[in-house]
Amino acid sequence: MDIVTPILTPFTKEGKIDVEKLKAHAKFLIDNGIDLLFVNGTTGLGPALSKEEKLTTLKTIYDVTNKVIFQVGSLNINDVIDLVKASKDFDIVGIASYPPFYFPRLPEKFLLKYFTTIANYSPHSLYIYNYPLATGYDISAKIVYQMKDLITGLKDTNQDLSHSLEYKILMPNLKVYNGSDSLVFYSLTSLDGSVTAASNYLPHVMKKMKEHITSGQVSKAIELQKLINKALDISRKYGQLSAIYYLVKEFLGYDVGYPRGPIFPLEEDEVKALLSEIQPVKKEIERAVS
């Protein structure tokens, strides 16, 4: 029952990775109940990072913890291989990658070859990152089954829990995480855990939910899921990936810098509106976890 944070990547106003803020955020998360950090995921703006930046995030976070799944996906296969090779210097939990995106009607054999190439170079366990909405390609359970001897786990960012369960039913030993914030409770109770972007600013809520589930207080855990959904609905109105940066400061009390285009920082009036709208939910959350 793992709570996995797809950790955001803090940037300066000039668009450089703020390594000190990244290190501090990683430490806070691990110290406050998060089990693993998913580095260079969607929330970390991984697809918009250079090869060098992806390695910088790994090096920075590794100074704090080795509880890391290192996402290396790219359309440049040479960059992917270089990152996988570089990971040999780090004692981490695993390597992950989304499939090649953009190119339509990609033959299944190309997809299999992509992940096989990573597995052949990787000294670590391999996790597949399935995000059909973003990549345009669904790595179904039947496709994953063909790679079952190569991989350890899978992150399925999908609003359909039954889709995630298909992997677990077909491959019981595969570690399966759902990546939807609205399904954290169901992922913790039905799968191996949840990769939840909201845990960047609500780690205490995720920790409390896990405690409720473990102690059999299911109704209390469901109430926390409802509060997560409220926060999620508000953040989406302003652009969820950008809003997370401001919500970390609001809920946790420290600065994590800015996002970077094409995920642009919010305008000042948007920040004020976001923080104003989140206040009632924040109070509900404080009461629920106290």
Curated annotation (Swiss-Prot):
GO molecular function: 2-dehydro-3-deoxy-6-phosphogalactonate aldolase activity; 2-dehydro-3-deoxy-phosphogluconate aldolase activity; 4-hydroxy-tetrahydrodipicolinate synthase activity
Pathway field: Carbohydrate acid metabolism; 2-dehydro-3-deoxy-D-gluconate degradation; D-glyceraldehyde 3-phosphate and pyruvate from 2-dehydro-3-deoxy-D-gluconate: step 2/2
Catalytic activity: 2-dehydro-3-deoxy-6-phospho-D-gluconate = D-glyceraldehyde 3-phosphate + pyruvate; 2-dehydro-3-deoxy-6-phospho-D-galactonate = D-glyceraldehyde 3-phosphate + pyruvate
EC number: 4.1.2.55
Residues holding substrate: T42, T43, Y129, N130, Y131, K155, D156, T157
Site feature: Proton shuttle: Y129
Domain of life from the UniProt record: Archaea
Active site: K155 (schiff-base intermediate with substrate)
Temperature remarks: Optimum temperature is around 90 degrees Celsius. Extremely thermostable.
Presence of the UniProt keyword DNA damage in the record: no
Activity-pH behavior: Optimum pH is 5.5.
Class of enzymatic activity (EC top level): lyase
Keywords: Carbohydrate metabolism, Lyase, Schiff base
Family: Belongs to the DapA family. KDPG aldolase subfamily.
NCBIfam families: Arch_KDGaldase
Task of the protein: Involved in the degradation of glucose and galactose via the Entner-Doudoroff pathway. Catalyzes the reversible cleavage of 2-keto-3-deoxy-6-phosphogluconate (KDPG) and 2-keto-3-deoxygluconate (KDG) forming pyruvate and glyceraldehyde 3-phosphate or glyceraldehyde, respectively. It is also able to catalyze the reversible cleavage of 2-keto-3-deoxy-6-phosphogalactonate (KDPGal) and 2-keto-3-deoxygalactonate (KDGal).
Protein name: 2-dehydro-3-deoxy-phosphogluconate/2-dehydro-3-deoxy-6-phosphogalactonate aldolase
Species name: Sulfurisphaera tokodaii (strain DSM 16993 / JCM 10545 / NBRC 100140 / 7)
